[in-house]
From Swiss-Prot:
Record bears the keyword Plastid: no
E.C. number(s) listed in UniProt: 2.6.1.9
Designated name of the protein: Histidinol-phosphate aminotransferase
Pathway info: Amino-acid biosynthesis; L-histidine biosynthesis; L-histidine from 5-phospho-alpha-D-ribose 1-diphosphate: step 7/9
A single MF term (Gene Ontology): pyridoxal phosphate binding
Length: 356
């Protein structure tokens, strides 16, 4: 076994909800820890999947996802040949790390952020360099620039950032990109950007065409509600797009995932309603935390990161009362997914009771 792998701590996914519910002896358990879409999936997706031609199940899927490629390109206003599809964004993180990292190369992140960036850097024998966020949990771009050396081959920017939910402006990101050496890749993860107010003005989707070292990633798991289908994509400059297609596993995205993603794109009203409901409930959470005197980060995503005395005890209290939220991301802090209006009301009442 490679030494770089033997010492790793694995990414630990959540237990199946039914398993955890049975262990706790609960009649109901609501998961607000994985940033899933609480409003489900577009009915058009269900129809499309049910109508899929099952006689094709013994055939390989369209390896290039041509129909979906054209739909995404039209939706985003980009060159269809710049798109590389992946099994969720997890596979894309693997592909990027495998492509651009060699042993002892360094990967730079603004911390805290998504743990898989560092995990896959270490799998490739690389080293993770973390620059702490500013006091308001925004990216310290000046600190990142100071940390860039010839050994740094990749810089990850998650926007909105997971777990903080903070959003960086397109102007700030492009100004940073312009200072980064062209041989250092800047990887922008926009998994949650659909939830961001004014997302069209925030997205870096057009930057890869201008800067060969920029990659922008998107997923269908969040606002589109397709987490179970495992489908995402990245947009590359033409300098790298064809090469990335050779790195990608053949037939990586199955036909049902492609069908589901196409149907999801064809129902923009579902996404619009999801985003609107999330914004309404997110604002209620911020008002609740203000009223309770709780410190939290300004979020442009479908989750909120907050600081709480006895955070571990609060999370334990909540899960034993039917609500699972995320722990372990920063000492004394918790992350909760913005749920439905009813779930949010119930959860807020439980927090009041715990505080009392």
């Amino acid at each position: 076994m490679k030494a770089s792998i033997e010492q790793l701590e694995p990414y630990v996914p959540e237990k199946p909800l039914a398993t955890l519910q049975a262990e706790l002896g609960l009649t109901e358990l609501v998961r607000l820890s994985a940033n899933e879409n609480p409003y489900g999936t577009s009915p058009k997706v269900a129809t499309a999947v049910k109508n899929w031609d099952f006689t094709q199940s013994n055939r390989y899927p369209d390896a290039d996802a041509q129909e979906l490629r054209q739909a995404v390109a039209q939706q985003q206003g980009i060159d269809p040949n710049s798109i590389v599809f992946s099994v969720g964004l997890d596979e894309m993180i693997v592909m990027l790390s495998r492509t651009f990292l060699a042993t002892n190369d360094q990967v730079l992140v603004s911390a805290p952020t998504f743990s898989e960036y560092g995990l896959h850097a270490e799998i490739e024998g690389g080293q993770l360099i973390s620059v702490p966020t500013l006091p308001n949990d925004h990216v310290n771009f000046e600190g990142l620039m100071k940390a860039i050396t010839p050994h740094v081959k990749m810089v990850w920017l998650c926007n909105p950032n997971n777990p903080t939910g903070t959003v960086e402006s397109l102007a700030a990101i492009e100004a940073f990109v312009q200072q980064v050496p062209p041989e250092t890749m800047v990887l922008i993860d926009e998994a949650y950007i659909d939830f961001t107010p004014g997302a069209a003005q925030v997205t870096a989707m057009q930057l890869p065409a201008k800067y060969p070292n920029v990659v922008v990633m998107r997923t269908f798991s969040k606002a589109y509600g397709l987490a179970n289908f495992r489908i995402g994509y990245a947009v590359f400059n033409t300098k790298y797009a064809a090469t990335m297609q050779t790195i990608r596993l053949p037939y990586n995205v199955n036909s049902l995932a492609q069908v589901a993603a196409l149907a999801a794109i064809d129902d923009p009203n579902f996404v619009k309603q999801t985003v609107q409901k999330n914004a309404t409930e997110r604002a209620k959470w911020m008002a609740f935390f203000d009223d309770q005197g709780v410190t939290y980060d300004q979020s442009g995503a479908n989750f909120i990161f907050f600081k709480y005395p006895s955070a571990t005890q609060l999370a334990d209290y909540l899960v034993h009362h039917g609500y699972l939220i995320r722990t372990g991301l920063r000492p004394g802090w918790l992350r909760l997914t913005v749920g439905t209006a009813n779930d949010n009301q119930q959860l807020q009442q439980l927090i009041r009771e715990f505080k009392a």
